[in-house]
């Protein structure tokens, strides 16, 4: 243990690096001496939650990570799954929350750049980007600035680098006012015999630094991402935000993929969080070797840089390679040809340490495992009972809001018809059209995007040989495709982390099934508040338990992901305001025949409309008003128990939907999520620009629960009358009691009507008006 007063650093200096006093003592014990300034910084970033997962690692161990498609699981730059026919898919999701809160454009842009590097570092050519975004209330000026800046940053980087942004989700809630969430997911295609991994090997092999130069931008970004934001963050933490160059990244992609084809690359690691420190430590530790690096050889863009700055810089578009000895010049020539930096900056050594040299002296010398694997782990106690806010929320019942009649519901002395309520929900930014967002993205570059953003419940990207990805007119005869979605209902998770997390996985799988894709694997991004607070850790632990159970049940193993904790800000009174717990799930699936898939909009007049899942006339605790968008937006109450996931029913419903699509019976499929059945029907009307005539069984004393209740593993689908007999025969055999024919598709630009079987009209809205309200909701707030 360090003796009092013996440290060359003050408690404030140690705390600035994100280290606790006991962690500093641990460092001294491991080194047998006090660290120097550079070493202190290295430990600070590598022992941050962002890099070492010291609070979350014990919880992540329960995730299923193996499956028939999984080739690479957690621990590498990205997960990899086998798609068949010699093709593999690398995919991963990662957060850039704190940087985007401080500098939204660059924060979001470099988030895209970073996740793309994780993909092509594995040897995969990036084929698509998705994102999950969360902001505060759009009536707030700062929220509008953050929202506009983040979307512009994503568009700038993705469009310039030539990778399509094909889908995602955007949520708005006051819980994210101080701390927005920016999660970026990327996918890449490969057909290599050997996946490029990060573990260094071969004593004497040269270590190459390639890509851009090193500057002082992004200093200590990993530590910054592992602490709460406060009122000074937008000014004081701005230097921790990186600055990206998508054009340079495009060259880096091509150079790296060309270099990998030579067979001269032994290992590769991108320089993301913690920069040179992380890349050297992780490569050494994973390979069981050491790395000797000379900072004097590192190309820099600023003068007078010291080891601390070199090692903690998070300048973008940089990579570290281990090359076969004697073939380094072959690789250097490739990078120079692409206009990039490439130098031999060190070598692999037998002693498992990270040795850093500067101006002829050893600037740092640390065991690799102390930085990368044998890091502090905190096994915290989980609350034995749900916290008070959850117990109070569970006391809520439908009696807290007026019962309503077939005509509508009285709110604050005024009768609101169910038609009025539906139109109001369509204007809620979380539900409303996201066209303002995705019209800024180039979603068709590479010519493989099968379904455009907003047209279906998941995106679909055609699979072509890697050699043809950059040539739009070649390899187009392939019928196989990959589908992807990214999802989370954070209000569910806030009110019940366990059930909410299960529902998140179920919804992601349901979205894939709605386009005919078989879900095969998951990447997760766990966005939570401080784990050092009992409630925050309970939320994290319960959510991980729910994710694990759902992934096992639906056979979607976790291949990797990201943990982003300390997503909290302080209000004017100095009280911490954590975000809603937000475990975002990115899920990928296989589409066997892209000519047999589904969009969410009605396709033909006279098609029959079915509801899969819990029927409308069945009272079930799987369908609830608790935690719904209706309760929050119309009654301004965040309360109640969210719907519980019946994973057996989910699997049955999803398999039935996929089979119907593959048989060519289904014309459309759309899952019932925020806003329940009524909103799902309206969205299908808007997307297809056709009306629908729906019959709703009578007998309910809660029409709002029938119309706007959520849950129940529900999917709204449409089928041609010519396939009715075959479809219903299949339903009777494989999904008895969990399907219902509820109506028909009507003529273009007509009306959505929901009528009881005693001829009471519950909802009657013109498609033109519904479309206008839905389409203009976000744009009108930004005008």
UniProtKB/Swiss-Prot annotation:
Superkingdom of this protein's organism:
Bacteria
Q: Which residues bind ATP?
A: 53, 92, 524, 561
Question: So, what pathway does this thing act in?
Answer: Purine metabolism; IMP biosynthesis via de novo pathway; 5-amino-1-(5-phospho-D-ribosyl)imidazole from N(2)-formyl-N(1)-(5-phospho-D-ribosyl)glycinamide: step 1/2
Q: Which parts of the sequence bind substrate? A: 95-98, 117, 242, 314-316, 564
Protein's UniProt keywords contain rRNA-binding: no
Q: What is its EC number?
A: 6.3.5.3
Question: What catalytic activity is recorded?
Answer: N(2)-formyl-N(1)-(5-phospho-beta-D-ribosyl)glycinamide + L-glutamine + ATP + H2O = 2-formamido-N(1)-(5-O-phospho-beta-D-ribosyl)acetamidine + L-glutamate + ADP + phosphate + H(+)
GO biological process terms, alphabetically, are: 'de novo' IMP biosynthetic process
**InterPro entries per the record?**
PRibForGlyAmidine_synth_PurL (IPR010074), PurL_linker (IPR041609), PurM-like_C_dom (IPR010918), PurM-like_C_sf (IPR036676), PurM-like_N (IPR016188), PurM-like_N_sf (IPR036921)
For Mg(2+) 2, which residues are the binding ones?
A: 118, 270
Q: What does UniProt give as GO cellular component?
A: cytoplasm
Q: Which Pfam families match?
A: AIRS (PF00586), AIRS_C (PF02769), FGAR-AT_linker (PF18072)
Write down the PANTHER family for this protein, in alphabetical order: PHOSPHORIBOSYLFORMYLGLYCINAMIDINE SYNTHASE SUBUNIT PURL
Q: What does the subunit comment say? A: Monomer. Part of the FGAM synthase complex composed of 1 PurL, 1 PurQ and 2 PurS subunits.
Instruction: State its role.
Output: Part of the phosphoribosylformylglycinamidine synthase complex involved in the purines biosynthetic pathway. Catalyzes the ATP-dependent conversion of formylglycinamide ribonucleotide (FGAR) and glutamine to yield formylglycinamidine ribonucleotide (FGAM) and glutamate. The FGAM synthase complex is composed of three subunits. PurQ produces an ammonia molecule by converting glutamine to glutamate. PurL transfers the ammonia molecule to FGAR to form FGAM in an ATP-dependent manner.
NCBIfam families registered for this protein in UniProt: FGAM_synth_II, PRK01213.1
Q: Which family does it belong to?
A: Belongs to the FGAMS family.
Instruction: Write the protein's name.
Output: Phosphoribosylformylglycinamidine synthase subunit PurL
What is the organism field in this record? Acaryochloris marina (strain MBIC 11017)
What taxonomic classification does the UniProt entry list for its organism?
Answer: Bacteria, Bacillati, Cyanobacteriota, Cyanophyceae, Acaryochloridales
């Amino acid at each position: 243990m360090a003796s009092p007063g013996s440290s060359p650093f003050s408690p404030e200096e140690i705390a600035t690096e994100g280290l606790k006093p006991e962690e500093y003592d641990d460092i001294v014990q491991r080194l047998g001496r006090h660290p120097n300034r550079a070493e202190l910084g290295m430990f600070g970033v590598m022992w941050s939650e962002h890099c070492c997962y010291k609070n979350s690692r014990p919880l992540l161990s329960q995730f299923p990570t193996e499956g028939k498609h999984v080739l690479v699981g957690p621990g590498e730059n990205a997960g990899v799954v086998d798609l068949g026919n010699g093709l593999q898919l690398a995919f991963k999701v990662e957060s850039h929350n704190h940087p985007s809160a401080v500098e939204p454009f660059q924060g979001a842009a470099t988030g895209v750049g970073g996740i793309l590097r994780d993909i092509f570092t594995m040897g995969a050519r990036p084929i698509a980007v998705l994102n999950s975004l969360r902001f505060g209330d759009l009536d707030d000026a700062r929220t509008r600035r953050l929202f506009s800046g983040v979307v512009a940053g994503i568009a700038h980087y993705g469009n310039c680098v030539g990778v399509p942004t094909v889908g995602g989700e955007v949520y708005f809630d006051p819980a994210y006012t101080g701390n927005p969430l920016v999660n970026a997911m990327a996918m890449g295609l490969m057909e290599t015999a050997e996946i490029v991994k990060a573990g260094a090997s071969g004593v004497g092999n040269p270590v190459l630094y390639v890509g851009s130069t090193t500057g002082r931008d992004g200093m200590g970004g990993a530590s910054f991402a592992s602490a709460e934001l406060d009122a000074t963050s937008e000014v004081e933490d701005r230097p921790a935000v990186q600055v990206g160059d998508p054009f340079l990244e495009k060259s880096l992609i091509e150079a790296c993929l060309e270099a990998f084809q030579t067979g001269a690359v032994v290992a590769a690691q991108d320089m993301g969080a913690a920069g040179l420190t992380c890349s050297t430590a992780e490569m050494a530790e994973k390979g069981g070797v050491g790395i000797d690096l000379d900072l004097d050889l590192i190309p820099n863009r600023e003068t007078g840089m010291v080891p601390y700055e070199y090692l903690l810089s998070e300048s973008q578009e940089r990579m570290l390679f281990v090359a076969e000895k004697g073939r380094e010049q072959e690789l250097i020539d490739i990078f120079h040809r692409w206009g990039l930096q490439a130098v031999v900056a060190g070598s692999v050594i037998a002693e498992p340490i990270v040795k850093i040299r500067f101006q002829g002296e050893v600037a740092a010398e640390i065991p690799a495992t102390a930085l990368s694997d044998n890091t502090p782990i905190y096994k915290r106690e989980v609350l034995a009972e749900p916290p008070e806010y959850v117990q109070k929320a569970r006391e809520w019942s439908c009696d807290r809001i007026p019962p309503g009649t077939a005509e509508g519901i009285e709110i604050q002395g005024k009768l609101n018809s169910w038609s009025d309520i539906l139109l109001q929900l369509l204007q809620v930014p979380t539900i409303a059209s996201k066209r303002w967002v995705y019209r800024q993205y180039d979603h068709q570059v590479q010519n493989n995007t099968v379904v455009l953003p907003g047209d279906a419940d998941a995106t679909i990207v055609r699979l072509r040989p890697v050699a043809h990805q950059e040539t739009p007119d070649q390899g187009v005869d392939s019928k196989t495709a990959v589908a992807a979605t990214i999802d989370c209902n954070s209000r569910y998770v806030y009110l019940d982390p366990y059930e909410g997390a299960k529902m998140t996985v179920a919804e992601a799988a349901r979205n894939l099934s709605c386009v005919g894709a078989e879900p095969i694997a998951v990447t997760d991004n766990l966005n939570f508040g401080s784990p050092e607070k009992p409630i925050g850790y309970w939320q994290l632990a319960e959510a991980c338990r729910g994710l694990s159970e759902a992934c096992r049940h639906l056979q979607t193993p976790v291949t990797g992901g990201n943990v982003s904790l300390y997503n909290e800000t302080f209000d004017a009174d100095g009280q911490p305001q954590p975000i809603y717990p937000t475990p975002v799930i990115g899920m990928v699936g296989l589409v066997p025949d892209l000519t047999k898939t589904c969009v969410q909009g009605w396709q033909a007049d006279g098609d029959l409309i079915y509801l899969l899942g819990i029927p409308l006339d069945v009272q079930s605790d799987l369908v609830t008003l608790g935690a719904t968008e209706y309760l929050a937006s119309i009654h301004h109450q965040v309360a109640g128990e969210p719907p519980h996931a019946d994973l057996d029913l989910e699997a049955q419903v999803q398999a039935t939907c996929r089979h119907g699509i593959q048989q060519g019976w289904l014309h459309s499929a759309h899952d019932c999520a925020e806003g329940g059945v009524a909103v799902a029907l309206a969205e299908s009307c808007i997307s297809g620009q056709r009306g629908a005539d729906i019959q709703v069984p009578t007998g309910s004393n809660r029409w709002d629960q029938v119309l706007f209740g959520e849950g129940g593993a529900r999917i709204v689908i449409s089928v041609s009358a010519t396939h009715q007999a075959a479809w219903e025969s299949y339903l009777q055999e494989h999904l008895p009691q969990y399907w219902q024919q509820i109506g028909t598709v009507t003529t273009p630009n007509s009306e959505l009507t929901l009528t009881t079987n005693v001829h009471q009209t519950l909802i009657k809205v013109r498609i033109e008006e519904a479309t206008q309200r839905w389409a203009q909701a976000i744009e009108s707030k930004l005008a």
